Amino acid sequence: DAYITEINENYAQLGNRKIGESKVEFITHDKDGNRLVRNAETNLGNFCSDALRVMTGADMSFVNGGGLRAPMESGDITFNDIFSVFPFNNQIVTAEISGQILIDFLEMAVMNYPEEDGSFPHMSGVTFSVNKSIPTSVKVDENGFFEKVDGAYRVYNVKVLDKTSGEYKALDPNGKYILAGFNY
C-alpha cells in the first residue's frame, strides 16, 4: 500500500540521517570474535555511558553490557547506528541514590564476573576494582532480585568523578549521587 511505503521511506530517511562521526570503531567483540561487552570495559560502553552522564547532567551513569547489541563502524554515525546499539524502547532515567546503594549495585552487577553476564556495568563518572578471588556473597530472591550482600564485598576502591576538580575521589557511602541509566 502506498501509505505504508511512504511511512517506511520517511523512517528510512530519518534513520540514515547523520548525527555525528567517529574516527574509531566502537566494539562489542574482540578481533577473535569473543564478546567483550558482558565482562569487560569497551569503548562502546564508555561512549554510551559518557553520553548518558553528560546529556543528563548526572554524577554518574551506567549501561549494562547486555543492552549493547551492536558495534558501530568508524565514519558517519546515523540514527540507525544508535537504534542498532539500543534496539529496545527504553527511556533514559535518573535517580538519587546513596553511595552504599551504588556499592551494592556494583556488587550485584559483577557478581558473576569474570563470566559473561548481561548486567556487567559500563560506567561513567565512577571507577572501581573487583577482587575476583573473593566468591560473591550477593543474595537474591526467587525472582533474581537483589536482597543483600551477606559477606565480603568483591568491589573496592570505588571513586566518583568530582565535577568541579575533574578528579576521582573516594565514594562516600552516606553521600547522595545522581545516577543515570535506562528503565528496562
Residue ranges with predicted function:
Residues 1-21, 127-134, 139-145:
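Binuclear metal-dependent phosphoesterase catalytic core
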Residues 3, 7, 29, 33, ...:
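Generic alpha-helix detector with strongest preference for long hydrophobic helices that associate
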Residues 18-41:
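Glycine-rich phosphate/diphosphate-binding loops and the adjacent beta-loop-alpha structural elements
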Residues 42, 46-184:
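Feature captures C-terminal
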